Amino acid sequence: MRKNILFITSCLLAATTFAEDINTLPKDTTKVIDIEEVVVIASPKETGKLRELPTAVSLLSQKDMQANQITTLKNVSSLVPNFFMPDYGSRLTSAIYIRGIGSRINTPAVGLYVDNIPYIDKSAFDFNFYDIERIDILRGPQGTLYGRNTMGGLIKVHTRSPFSYQGTDVKLSYGTKSNYRSASLTHYHRWSDCFAFSAGGYYEGSDGFFRNSLNGKKVDNMEAGGGRIHAIWLPSENLKLDFTIGYDYNDEGGYPYYYTGAIDGYDKENEKYKNYIGKISYDQDCTYRRGLFNTGLNIEYQAQKFILSAVTGFQNLNDRMFMDQDFLPVSIYTIEQKQRLNTISEEITFKSKNNKRWQWVTGVSGFYQWLHTTGPVNFMEDGVTDMIEGNINNTFKKIHLDDPRRTPEMSLDVLNNRIRVSGSFDTPVFSTAPF
């Protein structure tokens, strides 16, 4: 019995001594912190951090875009406050509104930069986001640094850098409602410590939602495809050359519009096309085709006390819009608009380095844009008979009835069953400004 008590007492003393030894061990001072992936994106014009700017900013990462199915700028309206881009018509309809400020025609009131290259014309704003790394949306005027077209705000789109990510991305999507399908493949390769590149392409298609009640065909079908090459070369420690080139092509219906009836002031009871009110029933195919080519070179030189950036961009847009302007099963008139747009831009920026107490930025920017537009209106058989002959002859008849003694009976007969009213416009634009 005494032996058992002695053995138990010895075990307890040993356990107490071991516990004291553990407690006297020095604590580990190494902290382990789990952080998410960090992406560093530099801008030629900002000298500080984006979150420190005195303006309202929304940032969308690639994860945010994937989680919310953000494939174009039109989808951003569901996430960013005070941002609205109407999702109707074709990709030609690309008006953007921030805080209610926007422009439906002519030059936009919201600027767009893709990899620090400005997109001057809003006809090019709607494109696919298959290889986008991040989107920055700055709400409020940004004209001090970015000049014209930024009264409402600014959108900056950044593609993924092949230096920060290597691998191959494959994306496939399919939807049953409109038979929507999309596929994209992009390869990112770091050749060495001085050179990296990425190359990829995408396809997107949809059968549409709206049917033409006249022939049963869907009128908002869409096919699109394109590709982009991005290359970065570091010839020295303080020199960087960033080159991008890309092309997008889309062919779509895009105009599921319908006739709404006679406007106020007309005889609505005797409406001639009453059976077609509220129905998509035009007899001509409404289509929009666009080819968009973009290329740019960003040269950055880091001196001891400042950073010099020179960004050169070129854009070519060639499109064709054909629309049945009467939206009826009769042949009244159509319009065919073609745009041929070329834009070359240059921005040279000097700015201080971020480790300096006094932060400054200055530079000069400019662009030249030449736009050739043709927009002929074609009056068809019913348009010649009803709109031209009918209206003129009704006017002649009214004049004769008002004063039959002094005015003879007159009438007009148009021999051609179709009349083409041509329209051709050249719109060159040049702009330059220091900042």
Give the role of each language-model region.
Residues 147, 175-179, 219-223, 276-279, ...:
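Short sequence motifs at beta-strands and strand-loop junctions characteristic
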Residues 115-141:
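Short acidic/polar hinge/loop motifs at secondary-structure boundaries
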Residues 22, 32-65, 94-95:
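N-terminal periplasmic "start-of-domain" segments of outer-membrane beta-barrel proteins
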Residues 240-246, 290-318, 335-435:
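Face-selective signature of the C-terminal outer-membrane beta-barrel domain
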Residues 74-117:
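Extracytoplasmic beta-strand/coil segments of soluble accessory domains associated
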Residues 164-165, 173, 190-284, 317-331:
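Periplasmic-side early beta-strands and strand-to-turn transitions of outer-membrane beta-barrels
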Residues 94, 108, 121, 130-133, ...:
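Outer-membrane beta-barrel translocator/receptor signature
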Residues 57, 65, 76-77, 135-140, ...:
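Non-catalytic regulatory/gating segments with a bias toward low-complexity or hydrophobic composition
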